[in-house]
């Protein structure tokens, strides 16, 4: 399974990419929203992990664009953010995210969410 991880924080990228790779996933990285949109089109991943706070196009807007594009609208998007308020979750879901999780990442919970998105 190929996962596109859209994240601008190098420490988060290093940590989660390694953990997901050890769990058997192929992980490709985009460091901003525009790159994430482009890579979703070129890589056609099975799942996108989307940070919501990005330096150019934020994760909500990137998700809206991905879900509005026939070439990428089928790809599940799981939002990852340090913001744990219910309003943040509601905005992410309204933007088109299929699920939402908080950072720091709880790996067993994230793996359950990934599995659930691939079953649906």
Q: Could you say what each language-model-derived stretch is?
A:
Residues 7, 31:
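Conserved acidic carboxylate
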Residues 14-22:
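Charged docking surfaces used in two-component/phosphorelay signaling
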Residues 51, 81:
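Active-site residues of response regulator receiver
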Residues 55, 73, 85:
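The feature encodes the CheY-like receiver
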Residues 105-114:
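C-terminal output helix
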């Amino acid at each position: 399974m190929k996962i596109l991880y859209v994240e601008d924080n190098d420490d988060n990228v290093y940590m989660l990419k390694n953990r997901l790779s050890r769990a058997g996933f192929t992980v490709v990285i985009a460091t901003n929203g525009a790159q994430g949109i482009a890579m979703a089109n070129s890589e056609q991943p099975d799942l996108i992990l989307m940070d919501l706070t990005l330096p150019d196009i934020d994760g909500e807007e990137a998700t809206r664009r991905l879900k509005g594009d026939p070439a990428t609208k089928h790809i599940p998007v799981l939002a990852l953010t340090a913001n744990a308020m219910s309003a943040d979750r509601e905005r992410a879901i309204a933007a088109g995210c299929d699920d939402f999780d908080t950072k720091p990442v709880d790996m067993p919970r994230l793996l359950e969410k990934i599995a659930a998105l691939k079953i649906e």
